[in-house]
Amino acid sequence: MAFGGIGELDDATLAKLFAVNATAPIVMLRESAALIADGGFFVNISGVVATQPVAGMAAYSASKAAAWAAMSSVARELRRRQIDVIDAQPPHTETGLASRAIAGVAPKMPVGLTPDAVAARIVAAIVAGERDLPVEAFAS
């Protein structure tokens, strides 16, 4: 995660965010697509910021949006093999990453979901055959 206005963003931070949040998931999907059995699935967690960007988090939001766009595209490619590419977009989750940002300081945020709650919701979606997990799917 990284926080701060666009004027505070340096190239190294931008590169790190895209490497971790966009390039890595895309490469993992590329490398695993041939290994996933027909009817299988691939899950990525982009988070709510992929489709609902937040002020002061432009680079982080953009990196997550890039992964979301790739997952959406590849989901169409793999549909004929009945492989579900699920991009989960949970709201703020208490992973501790906000307090260990690679740049900037996190604003005060409301208490987020627990990682266990997010994982349970994703597993339930897989079992139920859900293909879309927007932020609303994580509402209690």
Residue positions per predicted region:
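Active-site-adjacent segment of SDR/Rossmann-fold oxidoreductases
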Residues: 35-36, 52, 73-83
